[in-house]
Amino acid sequence: MMQRHAAIGSLLALALVSACKNEEPRGAAPPPPPAAKPAACAGGGGTLSDAQSAAFFPRTTAGFCLDPNGGDKTYGEGGSLPLDQICDMFDGECEIYKGFGVRRVVELRYVDGSGSAATIDVHLSKFGTTEGAYAMFTKRVVGDGDPAGEDTPRPIEGGGAAALGLGTAYLWRGAHLAEITYNDEAAAEPAIKALGDKLLAPLVKEIGAKLPGETALPPAAAALPEANRIPLGVRVVTKDLLGIPSTGGGAFGYYKDADKRYRFAVMVRADDEQAKDVLATLGKGPGAQKEKGIGDGAVRFMSKEGEAPAVEWIVARTGGRLVGIGDEVRVLRSGMTADEVAKVSLGKDEKIARLKDAIAKK
């Protein structure tokens, strides 16, 4: 009997061994991606196939080089790929780019000459106008957020304006916007930040010096008051800046004076008559009231964004330019008491005083 049990045990053991040999381990990690060649940059780096943008990018930068295997792609005007395919590249945000008038996009990358899998990925977009390119820059840097937030990119040197966030930099000049990202799946967030700061800032400065176009801001953004403005605290909106139909685009400026937060808004029109029409439209809203003694006419009204509390705006005209001052909705919340609102917002008289000062300086 014992011999029979031993034989059965041996057969079971053999069966288990055989089964283990035939089954793949479950939950095993996929094989790592192929590493870059240690001598990838030995030949001085690759070259770009897009003749329009090749001169903007150095072949080497801080131990990285343009991918010797090529792979750069051009979408839209003068490119081999249709512009609509940028939707795959920008995660479905192509309509935002199109709304700002994007004409072409070049995609390229730098590889690490030391052989790691790290890359510096670049998207260079060219827009139909300087205003469109700068508007997209401000959309990326500020967007719907608060430029005073800790996670907001900080200003760096380059082109007309540049910003550096966590492993990503943004560069604007003329009709161009460059978005430059340091990627390394093996690196933790602190390393991404440190290496991004080290690698991207000098690259942004170099590319910014080579891009064509003016570095002067579009007229509405340039007319924003500078005192108390938060670094990179500008947002250009090309359609209906204050959310009121038929009033057109312009620029917001974001400001902080001690605990007080507020915004300026500037809209520049072709002539006085167009500016008068905008002011008249603003004055037709529910509860809007005329204010005397400010510029060439002024109105006060309440504006509301989505679920956020309504905020007070006072907008004045001076020639073909409209300048407004309003509460900062990003620091307000539903249910705040009057005292809580007063701690972070300007009163009506304070708004009027700062508005008059802004008009007088421009």
Regions found by a protein language model. Name each.
Residues 1-18:
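Sec-dependent bacterial lipoprotein signal peptides
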Residues 20-121, 125-362:
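Soluble, non-membrane globular domain cores that form compact, hydrophobic packing
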